[in-house]
Amino acid sequence: MASLLSSSLPSCLPSLLFLLLQLTSSSAGQFRVIGPGHPIRALVGDEVELPCRISPGKNATGMEVGWYRPPFSRVVHLYRNGKDQDEEQAPEYRGRTQLLKETIGEGKVTLRIRNVRFSDEGGFTCFFRDHSYQEEAAMELKVEDPFYWINPGVLVLIAVLPVLLLQITVGLVFLCLQRRLRGKLWAEIENLHRTFDPHFLMVPCWKITLFVIVPVLGPLVALIICYNWLHRRLAGQFLEELRNPF
């Protein structure tokens, strides 16, 4: 029995070494793909960057790197054979993406998306493929209205306060000038011994009120109209993207 084992061991040794080398090479080629651990936020019309890297870090120049959008696997950007494959992009992303490859030698890449749209909101998947081995990571993009912080109350406050302060200041200056002018005229009239009606220079209250209120209401109405127009335009853009995603 011992002689049988000793005679068969040398013949099995090459097979064991080959299997060990295969396992070692297989484990050496494995890596993990890591994306941002939180949702990335962007405003409509701006540009956004989606970072992605492999761990442990290694040169990814010869790998296939890309981003796609689930659930239909629409290609957002694809890098293969050392160059970008623009012809394989989904139509809505052509001309809007750029792969930043300055640190690809360390296994780090970033996808830049220009002119962000409402339809870009949602999930993205980044993947690295090295021959037959592939890993990927999911990330989320949230798109916000650049005027989301403006509501009618804030708009009224922004519009009314500066104009109201300006009109109060102008009104006070106007009243001071009126009183000074009336005093000078009184002195001249007394010197000339003319009759003078004290109500001649009195300005009716409704005129002063109109002088203060009209300049306030004008800009306020204009700002409200501008606010509604901007929101209708953004809403129309969003509906148009939903109707024609491609």
UniProtKB/Swiss-Prot annotation:
Residues 175-209 are cytoplasmic. The gene is MOG. It comes from Bos taurus. One of its GO terms (molecular function) is signaling receptor binding. Residues 1-28 form the signal peptide. The chain crosses the membrane at residues 154-174, 210-230. Disulfide bonds join C52-C126. Mediates homophilic cell-cell adhesion. Minor component of the myelin sheath. May be involved in completion and/or maintenance of the myelin sheath and in cell-cell communication. Residues 29-144 form the Ig-like V-type domain. Found exclusively in the CNS, where it is localized on the surface of myelin and oligodendrocyte cytoplasmic membranes. Coiled coil: none annotated. This is Myelin-oligodendrocyte glycoprotein. InterPro entries: Ig-like_dom, Ig-like_dom_sf, Ig-like_fold, Ig_sub, Ig_V-set, IgSF_BTN/MOG, Myelin-oligodendrocyte_glycop. It is a multi-pass membrane protein. SUPFAM superfamilies: Immunoglobulin. Belongs to the immunoglobulin superfamily. BTN/MOG family.
